[in-house]
Amino acid sequence: MNTALAQQIANEGGVEAWMIAQQHKSLLRFLTCGSVDDGKSTLIGRLLHDTRQIYEDQLSSLHNDSKRHGTQGEKLDLALLVDGLQAEREQGITIDVAYRYFSTEKRKFIIADTPGHEQYTRNMATGASTCELAILLIDARKGVLDQTRRHSFISTLLGIKHLVVAINKMDLVDYSEETFTRIREDYLTFAEQLPGNLDIRFVPLSALEGDNVASQSESMPWYSGPTLLEVLETVEIQRVVDAQPMRFPVQYVNRPNLDFRGYAGTLASGRVEVGQRVKVLPSGVESNVARIVTFDGDREEAFAGEAITLVLTDEIDISRGDLLLAADEALPAVQSASVDVVWMAEQPLSPGQSYDIKIAGKKTRARVDGIRYQVDINNLTQREVENLPLNGIGLVDLTFDEPLVLDRYQQNPVTGGLIFIDRLSNVTVGAGMVHEPVSQATAAPSEFSAFELELNALVRRHFPHWGARDLLGDK
């Protein structure tokens, strides 16, 4: 146990009191992103070091690793605390998304250290999908680069509203206020292309020296704003899902005995209370909430993000993938939608292809009707393309095999976020954010039966040399 943790436990009056205090702290998930060698891993290492989250044996190992792999001469190479893969240490870069956890007296944190290289865009999108704040590192010597713009775009595309522009390596430009001001103005000019409801803050710092990371810098008296840690501790995160209507995707039907039938899942948005009238989609059947069951016993109400089991007053047909919402809300099912797609497979996404998709616990199929455009994520321009390559981001039109109940991703990431699954290999090949549900569901009959579709998939998987075409994708 490190000395800082031991002191915190002593101050709280014991382990149990400390654990209770930890449970009631707010949690902030954030990611660090920037161009290669901007100091992302060093910054996280500095945060862990200066908040005294490193154990003595880790510190001793860090001294030895700094001599073997370090790039900072006689100084501690704090990036080695985060760059865990052997390939990362040898190359001095970050490849995979590395998660780290730490806490202060005010808040708990989960950090995602995401790769800066363009070929790892899919890794960054994965890390950003669960975060509420993004730290965008900029090398003070280089200013705003294409990768800075790319990371800003991806962060906002995935719903992040709080951006902290950390202008790093100020020690290498003699802590120049003019350099900081110029980069700040350049970024604000670029940010005019981003959504207008963003909270953007700027902090000049040196992750290597510790200036303005966890403590105020004496080398930059011209900067009177908060340190990076103070920003992280005090930023107010207002979750969009709290103000949205009730959405409860059913993950599991729990029937341990003949006297109990409950529907388990995580409340995606809004709130639910005992006695509330709810509607099941897509069937449209209505009922009342009889009980809200949790691990700690029954509750009278539940809020977004809580894992609960709902018991209804009526015995109705509900299965995994169905959606419960307030009975008085009119939410039509849709057969198609425009979707922002981050493509993650070597084989490009092309019109006419079909994939399994998974959204809020429901699995179905979708066909790619067309690609409206691909976004050049370096300058945010749009261009027409025939297919979407690996790490490409674009707006795609999808038609679903059955009616779905969708929200826009910016309103509800759970009922607006989906993944693409290759039907032969069962590998996740893309991530999608619903841009707009575009048409109401129609009762058009299917050309092929479910048995024929399953048989077709089986033949193409085990007998590819037969050359059987995909009945859904017509390829």
From Swiss-Prot:
Pathway noted in the entry: Sulfur metabolism; hydrogen sulfide biosynthesis; sulfite from sulfate: step 1/3
Residue segments, region G4: 168-171
Listed name of the protein: Sulfate adenylyltransferase subunit 1
Residues of the signal peptide: none
Keywords per UniProt: ATP-binding, GTP-binding, Nucleotide-binding, Nucleotidyltransferase, Transferase
KW Nucleus (keyword) present: no
GO BP, sorted A to Z: hydrogen sulfide biosynthetic process; sulfate assimilation
Assigned EC number: 2.7.7.4
Record function comment: With CysD forms the ATP sulfurylase (ATPS) that catalyzes the adenylation of sulfate producing adenosine 5'-phosphosulfate (APS) and diphosphate, the first enzymatic step in sulfur assimilation pathway. APS synthesis involves the formation of a high-energy phosphoric-sulfuric acid anhydride bond driven by GTP hydrolysis by CysN coupled to ATP hydrolysis by CysD.
GO molecular function: ATP binding; GTP binding; GTPase activity; sulfate adenylyltransferase (ATP) activity
Domain tr-type G: 25-239
Provenance organism: Escherichia coli (strain 55989 / EAEC)
Region (G5): 206-208
Chain sites annotated for binding GTP: 34-41, 113-117, 168-171
Region (G3): 113-116
NCBIfam families: CysN, PRK05124.1, small_GTP
HAMAP family assigned: Sulf_adenylyltr_sub1
Residues covered by region (G2): 92-96
Regions annotated as coiled coil: none
Subunit text: Heterodimer composed of CysD, the smaller subunit, and CysN.
Enzyme class: transferase
